[in-house]
Amino acid sequence: YEREVELGGYFMELGGWERAHGYAANEHLLEKYGNRVPVRENEWDNRHFWRVSNAEQLALSEDCGIINLSHFYMFDVEGPDHVALMEWLCAAKIGGDNNIGKGIYTHFLDDEGNVRADLTIFRMEDRCRIVDGADAGPRDYHYVKRIAEDKGFDVTVTDVSEEYTTIGIWGPNARENLKKVVSDPAALDPENFPFAAIRNLEIAGKKVSALRLSYVGEQGWELHMKYEDGLAVWDALRAEGIMAVGVETYANSRRLEKSLRLQNADLLTQYNLYEADLARPKVKEADFRGKEKHLEYRARDKQ
């Protein structure tokens, strides 16, 4: 937060977090991109918006940038039934040894097969870590706990949001820039770090769990670390000249470029995954909540 204040962050609140949507320090980009950054002439359209955010997303698309994702809500599900519970809750396949060490983008459905949650699962050997948004995270945490209790799954569900923080790095030059700060640059090569994989790295002497996943339509990584290590990692990346980009680029403009949906805005329980254009090509064999209705929607000629 202190670094974002120094950069002249334009803050808005979400789920109790003050998030910088753009930075005054990047307003020189407005001159660089000129009329590629539109002017919103109507007050209602310009409210709670800063033009520099659109310039930042153009710069990220040409090079790379880092984004503060400290607002992520995270909780661990562990115990004898942790995989069984997540398999029941998630539309995507969670079980199987091949998924250990991967990040899995998935959804929770309700009994009508409609979307009630949109999140990422870290599949570890002994637990699953749910990485969620600041607004939907507390709701999904209590939902998982309630389902586990109601259905008798032998698990422990623990909020770890205040233990870990996240920095995103994305853009066509993300790999080469990230190589400058990790202790083992070769670990980032495509053959060593496939898409959706989780690998342990070291940056500025700090242990970092990196997930190769993109919410913004550009190559890159989520960097997860102990909360107290976040500032050192951020400073190491900034020391290499990597631009800080506001969360507007992550949450809106680049997300829309990738054709992803935003929970509680685009994604509501009145829509199924086919209507949202987020359904996977195949439906997993394992049973999951809402599967019967999901298959019914799949069989329709049109939604």
Question: Which ranges hold each PLM region?
Answer:
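Glycine/proline-enriched, intrinsically flexible loops and inter-domain linkers
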Residues: 1-303
